[in-house]
Design a protein with these regions (language model features):
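Short, basic/aromatic recognition patches that contact phosphate-bearing ligands
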Residues: 210
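Alpha-helical bundle regulatory/interaction domains
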Residues: 1-150, 160-165, 179-182, 186-200, ...
Length: 235
């Protein structure tokens, strides 16, 4: 009962994660802030659906189709769709035309991927010029210092992601905190590991970005949540 996730990493530099999810006897979930945009595909009652999900800057409540099976591709920060400026996707999304086995993007029909061939779809999108990425953002994400001004870095980061660098760091840290708490790490340990100022600072971040308290995350309480809490944190 609820949402059952399975998430894996990808060896593609364009992809953050690939995930599947099934919903059972759940009508809504707590959505969790994310710095990534994605492609999501699901089927319900024999009908296929596809959509683009944008980065989310805060938590909220979202409807969930009952008894549906989802496949999702979360793209690496700095990857974007050439036809859709990232800023237009923030806290939003786009529904795509879909049929059994195919969906339409940028005027072209593409085969709907399974979890195992997400990378093949992404490579086709890259070759077609539908997916693009800013190498400067990728450079920054690896911890390198670019030889341009801070203003140029921020401008290009926003253009590539729709978000400020600081917002991305806060969102990613809160998601990591949620997973650590769900995995049993004490609050004090999370504060120390992720360099929050103190426990109230962590509590505010969880409230804003995750929609759960530390106690709820530790106890697995609060209902369905749009985050695979069993997926290990990289922080």
């Amino acid at each position: 009962v609820g949402l059952r996730f399975d998430t894996r990493e990808s060896d593609s530099r364009w992809i953050d994660t690939v995930w599947t999810c099934t919903s059972e006897q759940v009508a809504e979930m707590t959505s969790v802030a994310t710095a990534c945009w994605g492609l999501v595909f699901h089927e319900r009652d024999g009908q296929a659906y596809a959509g683009i999900t944008g980065p989310e800057t805060k938590t909220g409540t979202a409807p969930v189709p009952e008894d549906a099976s989802f496949v999702g591709i979360e793209f690496a920060v700095g990857t974007s769709l050439r036809p859709v400026p990232p800023s237009l996707l923030v806290d939003g999304g786009v529904e795509l035309e879909a049929d059994r086995g195919a969906f339409r993007l940028d005027g072209v029909q593409w085969a709907t991927p399974s979890p195992d061939d997400a990378e093949a779809l992404v490579e086709r999108l890259v070759r077609a010029g539908v997916l693009i990425r800013d190498p400067l953002v990728a450079h920054i994400r690896l911890g390198h210092c670019p030889e341009v001004t801070a203003r140029t870095v921020e401008r290009r980061f926003r253009a590539a992601t729709g978000l400020a660098q600081g917002a991305v760091r806060q969102i990613e840290r809160a998601r990591a905190a949620a997973r650590l708490l769900a995995g049993g790490l004490p609050v004090a340990g999370v504060v120390s590991r992720l360099e929050y100022f103190d426990e109230p600072h962590l509590a505010r971040a969880l409230r804003r970005y995750v929609g759960r308290t530390a106690r709820q995350l530790g106890a697995g309480a609060g209902g369905a949540i749009g985050l695979d809490l069993n997926h290990p944190s990289t922080s």
